[in-house]
Amino acid sequence: MWKRGRLRPQNAPERRIRQFAQLICQSEWLFSEMLVQPSVKGMRQLLCQPSLTVTEKQSMVTLPPAIGKQSMDILLINTLLPYRYAYAVAHQDHVGAQTALKLMQEIPAENNTIIRQWQMLGQQVRTAADTQALIQLYQHYCQNERCIHCEVGQQVFRLNHIDVDSNNK
């Protein structure tokens, strides 16, 4: 069951599934092309297929691309680049794995609640690689109240003159 609270119509799950199916149909070799694409710009172009729709007269009309740059980047950050990295590691392709990491560093940082909280603590966030690392720290340490086991949490304790070593048992 999909949650639709505060969901814009253009982001409805049915619409996104239709767009993804259309993308797959329009590009027979999409997966292969994504694996060898050397740039973020090239990966965005693969995702930037024009959208087709049916008018009242059942004629096909080409519309502007179905998703914007920010949505493409979110797809790259959360789906395609991690998959590309995992695929490279599974096939012992060290160059491919490094390329996936390099591409993650070329995408601008996400802007979300978790990242804004890190920035309020003074953490510099420049790239998608930074945001993914900070989200991982948040999910592993902050959400589980494991501050004392986290390097960042320990630094905050030291700044507030809380003895970390006596509490770390």
Predicted regions and their residues:
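Hydrophobic, aromatic-lined core segments that form the binding pocket/scaffold
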Residues: 1-132
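Acidic, carboxylate-rich catalytic segments that either coordinate divalent cations
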Residues: 120-169
